[in-house]
Amino acid sequence: MVATVREHRIGDVRWTIVRGPREAAFHALGAHAAADIRTVLDGLPAWPVTARARRSPVLFRAIESASQVEHPDAYAELTALAAGAGVPFDDLLLANLRGDLGAGDGTGCTDLAWAPSLLGHNEDGAPVFDGIGRLLTLLIDGEPGVCVWWYPGFLPSNTCTVTTHGLVWGIDSVNVVTPSPCAGRHFVARTAQRATSVAEAVSVLRSHASAGGFAYTMGQVGSPSLVVVEKAGHDTAVTTVDSGFSWHTNHFRQLPPSLDSASEESLARAEVCAHLAPVAPDAKWLVSALTSAVHRNASDGDELMTLSTVVTDLASGEVTVVPRGGGPLRARAADLALGDIDAVTALNGAIPGE
């Protein structure tokens, strides 16, 4: 069956919408984004990860095997993406397992939340992603629609997520010192996107081991509840944000600190977050905080930059997306997950670019 890929631009935000059967859709996406995928593979600071994979080939292949067996759909998606882009599968696999090998993965991120219904995410990554990251909506046959901020070449699961079930989350990368031979964390996160509720998503994360570490700050449109889930190996910590302000950077706050290696930069950002004092918290305040106090610029020894900011009001269902150096895009969460370009265009008073 035929898959379709449509490229749009609303204001400063690129938005790719893919429809069709799973493997055909990912093959078409790979072909569409082939040049950007090659740019990413050529530009990633890969030597520490490559060295670790070569030193620990048994671990690398064990993580691959667990990913394939436990998350066959996501594994098939990555296989089709590589084939469509015309790049070696192992190159994409290594890129997607960067954070599962104990060598650091070159990503960061910050999540802020205010109970019961505000959730904000800064997507921090390597400069190679600047200008080629974009919104990606996946409309895979028989599955809920999913919208993410996408890094070309990566499974669409390691950044922030909005689904047609109203699930919303942002992910912070956490470097696990001694990974277990479990499935790659991108694969686990992709499986979680099929959940219909926060409780189901948490259950998926509890029941699926992850070699690397992720921290999820999640909620659901129309449901006044926020939770933070930290995941590494077979360990899971779930914290409900009952009231007030919550934050997370790139080290664990609930799981044992012996599991991860906290960078000085993550600790410094955490200190900034801990001293943020929202007087009248709303979506505008979250956008302001994320685009100023903890915004990163790949300078002064920091290798990463903030590529986008995404803030969701779970009460109203409105999402604000701010690409690096660009103006904000407003959208309803459901419209992003459904790929409703007309609705989002109308809300922003713009003409979509093809």
Model-flagged regions — what are they?
Residues 1-87, 98, 115-354:
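C-terminal, well-structured catalytic/ligand-binding subdomain of enzymes
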Residues 90-120:
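Gly/Pro-rich turn-and-neighbor structural signature
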